[in-house]
Regions:
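Structural signature of tandem-repeat unit edges
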Residues: 1, 9-10, 14, 19-21, ...
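A short beta-strand element within beta-rich, extracytoplasmic domains
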Residues: 16-40, 84, 123-130
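Non-cytosolic beta-sheet module surface loops
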Residues: 23, 33-40, 89-91, 156, ...
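Noncatalytic modules at the cell exterior or secretory-pathway interfaces
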Residues: 29-31, 75-92
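Short beta-strand segments and strand-loop junctions that repeat across beta-rich extracellular domains
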Residues: 42-56
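Solvent-exposed serine/threonine-rich low-complexity stretches and specific carbohydrate-binding patches
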Residues: 52-68
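Register-specific detector for alpha-helical tandem repeat solenoids, activating on a conserved position
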Residues: 140, 166, 192-193, 218-219
Length: 243
């Protein structure tokens, strides 16, 4: 596409770097990307470490009626201290409860940076603003119990889809600061249980209270025991609700 043709549509604030993890700790950390897909459709992903070449990545499906306790096959990538791991690819179209999630070894210190939309398409992901184009459960449980994660990536989408960020950071008890969000239109259960059990979280993004959708903020900060206040927007005026 000619950039001139759609330059007015691109959010200039979107990071053009693919989603990536940086090991800032002093020990190796295993990281893998796994899918939960009832229809067993294999998404296509690539990864690279530091300035290396992009390599194909096998995403195993954890949904299997033969193995009700979870995935029996794994594809971990060893991330050494000071190394950076990049991911990009094409997410499967979702018409049911299917999603991708990371498995991360405990006991490390991992920063996440870049544009999370590189998990939706491998190129020009920085044009994405409407998550409805990628189905429901877009980033559902993406960092499920990734206890080595110490921060959250910026969330660029303007228009959310149902359950898109539901349980996204559940159990990520290393995160202290909430991500910057750019939401203009909510969806049902979009932020449901998003930070549940993030007991080190100390702040929240500014949350809109106009045009709410069913369960959009339901238990968003449940058991966030370090949180003292939640920042809400009423008629374009910032307000605070104490814990």
């Amino acid at each position: 596409l000619d950039p001139i043709d759609h330059a007015v549509d691109i959010p200039i604030y979107q990071d053009k770097t693919p989603l990536h993890f940086i090991n800032i700790g002093d020990r190796d950390c295993n990281i893998e990307l796994t899918s939960y897909c009832i229809k067993n459709i294999n998404p296509q992903y690539e990864y690279k470490i530091n300035d290396g070449e992009w390599l194909k990545y096998k995403v195993y499906n954890s949904y299997n009626i033969m193995y009700p306790n979870g995935c029996q096959e794994h594809n971990p990538i060893i991330l050494h201290p000071n190394d950076t791991l990049y991911f990009r690819g094409s997410r499967l179209d979702q018409i049911d409860k299917s999603y991708l999630y990371f498995i991360m070894q405990d006991g490390s210190s991992i920063e996440v940076r870049g544009n999370i939309h590189s998990l939706l398409k491998p190129d020009e992901f920085y044009y994405i603003t409407d998550l409805n184009d990628y189905g429901i459960y877009t980033f559902y449980s993406l960092f499920y119990h990734c206890k080595s994660l110490i921060n959250a990536p910026q969330l660029y989408a303007h228009i959310l889809s149902a359950s898109c960020y539901e349980k996204m950071f559940i159990g990520c008890d290393g995160i202290k600061n909430s991500p910057v969000i750019h939401t203009l239109k909510l969806a049902s259960s979009c932020y449901r249980d998003m930070f549940i059990y993030c007991d080190k979280l100390t702040n929240t993004p500014l949350l809109s209270t106009s045009k709410l959708e069913p369960s959009c903020y339901y238990r968003m900060f449940y058991e966030c025991t370090s949180l003292k206040e939640i920042k809400l927007s009423f008629d374009d005026n910032d307000k605070y609700i104490k814990k």
